[in-house]
Design a protein with these regions (language model features):
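Anion-recognition interface
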Residues: 2-330
């Protein structure tokens, strides 16, 4: 499938191809009014990306669109409302001011095998930001989030893990299967492989990796390191409020309507969600239909089993990123 957008001096093509690198070819040059992102927060899911996105949005030298997680890139990703067009994607950044760094945050870019190559060809000098968390904790938080979004029909985390092999074969998927890959818990946290894809394409000097643990224990220092990486004023200090905390749904029916509207409504929702006012109204409705509630601890025996299972991967990830992750194995 091929997307094409024509501008006064630019033709941008996105060719959807199989393999690790899918091609975006562009005729380079200065095009008045066309702004493209130059940095990307690519994941990981449930690892502090929403907080970092909000903190960066408040920086006067940084522009990030109102719509978090546009997920424009990635031929191997599914989307609730379908893939936006290139013109819709570029429109997200049209309010950026001269001299601002321009970025976006789509947490499933880390999972995708095609996104790194697409970003590199779309924005050749792009910088990549990755937040990481203990994969066992990510899976557990992921399950809670999918339950909140009415995308997971297995209330028990262990049952959801047990269903993963069948789901990867297209079986036992909950109705409607909006984004099946989000249900592949173990497969989605193969962080060493995912990061190596980005390092091969962008090199270590253009990939900044931070830990969720650091963001929690020393938010200011972690944020300042990101600002240094982006080359913007590192002394700016936003309100370090908590974002995207664990919540419980009040009405499952309302939640399903918001996240998975019926077919006749889905087309309109796809268009309307691009407007900031509609987006704010949706967020307000989500807020009314939920209440903050601390996540119950994972079953101790299951957690111990998963930590043993993921110990080799954590050790390999430690080598890839050059950080001591021994605390994750406790």
């Amino acid at each position: 499938m091929r997307y094409r957008v024509r501008g006064p001096e630019e033709i941008v093509e996105l060719s959807r191809r199989s393999g690790e690198v899918s091609t975006i070819q562009s005729v380079q040059g200065t095009v008045e009014g066309v702004v493209r992102p130059d940095f990307f927060i690519v994941g990981a899911f449930k690892s502090g990306t929403t907080a970092l996105y909000e903190y960066l949005r408040s920086h006067p030298q940084v522009f990030m669109p109102f719509l978090k997680e546009p997920h424009f890139f990635g031929d191997d990703l599914t989307r609730h409302y379908g893939r936006m067009s290139l013109s819709e994607y570029l429109a997200l950044f049209r309010d950026a001011q001269p001299g601002q760094r321009v970025g976006e945050a789509s947490t499933w870019y880390l999972y995708s095998t095609t996104v790194p190559g697409q970003i590199a060809e779309f924005s050749p000098q792009a910088q990549i930001i990755i937040l990481l968390r203990n994969p066992v904790d990510v899976m557990y938080a992921q399950h809670s989030q999918l339950r909140f979004r009415a995308d997971e029909d297995q209330a028990d985390f262990a049952s959801a893990l047990e269903a993963e092999p069948a789901r990867r074969r297209g079986e036992r998927l909950p109705p409607p299967p909006a984004r099946p890959e989000t249900l592949f818990y173990r497969h989605s946290v193969q962080f060493a492989d995912q990061i190596e894809r980005y390092l091969r394409i962008f090199g270590r000097d253009r990939v900044h990796i931070a830990l969720f643990d650091d963001l929690v224990t020393d938010t200011a220092a972690t944020y300042r390191a990101v600002l240094d990486f982006l080359g913007v004023d590192p002394t700016f200090r936003p309100d370090f409020a908590v974002h995207n905390e664990s919540k419980r749904v009040r009405s499952g029916a309302i939640q399903r309507l918001i996240y998975n509207p019926p077919g006749p409504v889905r087309g309109a929702a796809r268009v309307l969600r691009r407007y900031p006012l509609v987006h704010r109204a949706r967020d307000a409705l989500l807020g009314l239909n939920s209440r903050a509630e601390g996540r119950q601890p994972m079953d101790a025996r299951l957690r111990a089993e998963l930590l043993d299972e993921f110990a080799p991967q954590i050790e390999r990830l430690s080598t890839v990123i050059g950080r001591d992750l021994s605390a994750w194995r406790n």
